[in-house]
């Protein structure tokens, strides 16, 4: 198959992932992984990290950093804690690092803006937002009680309910807990 055909297929796949494509993705769509390196050598795709590439001609979005953080960690990685709140612009959080949860040991050298949290979450606390594996907003609010001010979490709870990210019952439960703690 011609290189342009590989590039086009990878591009079509990467569009749904903020311009990123992983070696595992290439394998899944039956493109030899070696083709990623060839495209990078020709400047058609940028090598970001081991097994991770990006088409820089796709405009960046506010979600890129979150997707990249999870992709760099790989495996069962997911956003967790204040990163989930930041993804949804809840609670006026602006963390300096993107917290990524995983149950496995990570040996890769990661940039300083990625913080690993060793955790194993039940399936009910895992989801995907904007095609990014993530802990649920409910789990994130629970995990941020000691690090985010109660007033901000109360606003986050109401905003999350408004956006359909929490049920009415979850909103009531969190409001009762947070107002009692305040």
Where are these regions (language model features)?
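Short gly/ser-rich loop at a beta-strand->alpha-helix junction or flexible surface loop bordering the NTP-binding
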Residues: 2-9, 15-139, 143-182
């Amino acid at each position: 198959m011609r290189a342009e055909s590989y590039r086009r297929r990878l591009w079509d796949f990467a569009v749904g992932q903020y311009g990123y494509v992983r070696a595992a993705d290439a394998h899944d769509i039956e493109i030899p992984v070696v083709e990623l390196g060839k495209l990078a050598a020709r400047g058609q795709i940028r090598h970001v990290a081991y097994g991770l590439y990006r088409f820089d001609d796709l405009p960046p979005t506010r979600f890129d950093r979150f997707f990249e953080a999870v992709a760099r960690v790989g495996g069962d990685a997911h956003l967790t804690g204040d990163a989930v709140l930041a993804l949804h612009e809840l609670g006026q959080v602006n963390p300096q690092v993107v917290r990524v949860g995983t149950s496995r040991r990570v040996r890769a050298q990661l940039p300083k803006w990625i913080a690993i949290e060793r955790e194993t979450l039940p399936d009910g606390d895992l989801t995907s937002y904007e095609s990014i594996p993530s802990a649920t907003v409910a789990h994130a609010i629970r995990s941020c009680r000691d690090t985010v001010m109660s007033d901000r979490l109360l606003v986050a709870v109401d905003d999350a309910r408004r956006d359909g990210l929490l049920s009415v019952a979850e909103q009531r439960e969190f409001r009762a807990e947070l107002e009692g703690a305040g």
